């Protein structure tokens, strides 16, 4: 009988499929994985500790840099925790804007995941297609916040500002004709809501394109079907949330089970898998993009018909307008004090969670009555998913490690924090 010699293999952190700085120490027996030991900490930046030394409103930007593909969803969890401490509720228009931007973020995340996952297992065309649509949504980010990635758009008590009436346009260039320029700017003549309306009309056809490339592709199915399945019971025990939990057949979604923002006012479905394998997790995320379009469309229609304030009318947390600040010395002082010293919150502890694209993103805040947190604890979904790597990959091939990591959709900004 042939004997296999076991050996140890380092997968990452310098590996194109490691999704950041993941280091997996694999114990191999031939091509089969006998054990996988994830090593984390290579992207540790002490976010939770840094937040303890800054006023509440100065730590919003740190949240963007946790899961740096799901920026506004991270902000949402943090500002919800602050709002719970303060006992305030944002205006309804702000709630709808948050809901809409959360779903824009979900599509952004899933497009990045689908392109990267496809590239990992050899489907390069999907990568080129997904980034075409992703660029449109990055422009929405830029229009509402001024930044393409680290938006810092949400605020305790609402959002930074109302949705702008104009979308950024492409400038003339020597590399594109006037006809191409007109076509590229066709949907950008109106407001952000007009642009999103147009996006919602054409994006389902784009998702159909992705599915044409992948869903019934025999190579794609050979790489994903029956790879690293997890049962519903075991997924719950392992602390899975988001698409991984729903891919295993558990219909748990905070947007439905514990509604926040305007999710109880919009209609959408929760996609659920059957087999809990990598292929089901793929199907769940693709269907989530379709459901996000439904939610965005409903939010756009409501926001068109219902103008109103986007920040709570409370000078304790809301700065004066720019006009007031430039006309009135007291408003200028108020603005300066608010952004340098912040505001004190009542003593207590709260936990606030949102359904981020990767799962439940939670923020646990402890206040001692000061203007900065006594303790901030972030509950990132990817941390729990990565912890199950060893159990999920045992007995599978080395090539399946790449499939599993892509299927988990790990981002190390939130794992290492």
Swiss-Prot record:
It catalyses: a quinone + NADH + 5 H(+)(in) = a quinol + NAD(+) + 4 H(+)(out). One of its GO terms (molecular function) is NAD binding. It is a peripheral membrane protein. Belongs to the complex I 49 kDa subunit family. NDH-1 is composed of 14 different subunits. Subunits NuoB, C, D, E, F, and G constitute the peripheral sector of the complex. It is found in: Cell inner membrane. Pfam families: Complex1_49kDa (PF00346). It comes from Halorhodospira halophila (strain DSM 244 / SL1). SUPFAM superfamilies: HydB/Nqo4-like. Keywords: Cell inner membrane, Cell membrane, Membrane, NAD, Quinone, Translocase, Transport, Ubiquinone. Its main location: membrane. NDH-1 shuttles electrons from NADH, via FMN and iron-sulfur (Fe-S) centers, to quinones in the respiratory chain. The immediate electron acceptor for the enzyme in this species is believed to be ubiquinone. Couples the redox reaction to proton translocation (for every two electrons transferred, four hydrogen ions are translocated across the cytoplasmic membrane), and thus conserves the redox energy in a proton gradient. The lineage of its organism: Bacteria, Pseudomonadati, Pseudomonadota, Gammaproteobacteria, Chromatiales. This is NADH-quinone oxidoreductase subunit D. InterPro entries: NADH_Q_OxRdtase_suD (IPR001135), NADH_UbQ_OxRdtase_49kDa_CS (IPR014029), NDH1_su_D/H (IPR022885), NiFe-Hase_large (IPR029014). Its EC number is 7.1.1.-. GO terms for cellular component: plasma membrane. It is an enzyme of class 7 (translocase).
């Amino acid at each position: 009988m042939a004997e296999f010699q076991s050996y140890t293999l380092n997968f990452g952190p310098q590996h194109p499929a490691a999704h950041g700085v993941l280091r997996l120490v694999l114990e191999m027996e031939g091509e089969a994985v006998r054990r996988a030991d994830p090593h984390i900490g290579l992207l540790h930046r002490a976010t939770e500790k840094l937040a303890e030394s800054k006023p509440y409103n100065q730590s919003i930007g740190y949240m963007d840099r946790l899961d740096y593909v799901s920026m506004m969803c991270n902000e949402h969890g943090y500002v919800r925790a602050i709002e719970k401490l303060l006992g305030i509720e944002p205006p309804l228009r702000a709630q709808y804007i948050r809901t809409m931007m959360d779903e824009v973020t979900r599509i952004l995340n899933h497009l990045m995941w689908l392109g990267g996952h496809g590239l990992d297992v050899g489907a390069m065309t999907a990568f080129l297609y997904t980034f075409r649509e992703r660029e449109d949504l990055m422009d929405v980010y830029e229009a509402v916040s001024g930044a393409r990635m680290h938006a810092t758009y949400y605020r305790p008590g609402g959002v930074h500002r109302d949705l702008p009436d104009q979308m950024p346009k492409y400038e003339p260039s020597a590399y594109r004709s006037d006809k191409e320029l007109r076509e590229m700017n066709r949907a950008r003549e109106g407001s952000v809501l007009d642009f999103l309306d147009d996006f919602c009309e054409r994006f389902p056809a784009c998702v159909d394109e992705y599915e044409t490339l992948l869903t019934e592709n025999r190579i794609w199915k050979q790489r994903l079907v029956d790879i690293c399945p997890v049962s519903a019971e075991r997924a719950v025990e392992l602390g899975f949330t988001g698409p991984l939990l729903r891919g295993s057949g558990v219909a748990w979604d905070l947007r439905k089970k514990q509604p926040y923002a305007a999710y109880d006012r919009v209609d959408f479905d929760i996609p659920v898998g059957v087999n809990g394998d990598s292929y089901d997790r793929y199907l769940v995320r693709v269907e989530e993009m379709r459901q996000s379009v439904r939610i965005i469309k409903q939010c756009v229609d409501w926001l068109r018909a219902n103008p109103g304030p986007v920040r709570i009318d409370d000078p304790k947390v809301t700065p004066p307008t720019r006009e007031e600040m430039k006309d009135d010395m007291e408003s200028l002082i108020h603005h300066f004090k608010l952004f340098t010293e912040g505001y004190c919150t009542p003593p207590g502890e709260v936990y606030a969670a949102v359904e981020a694209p990767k799962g439940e993103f939670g923020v646990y805040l402890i206040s001692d009555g000061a203007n900065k947190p006594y303790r901030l604890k972030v509950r990132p979904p990817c941390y729990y998913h990565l912890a199950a790597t060893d159990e999920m990959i045992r007995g599978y091939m080395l090539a399946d490690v790449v499939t599993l990591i892509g299927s988990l959709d790990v981002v190390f900004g939130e794992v290492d924090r």
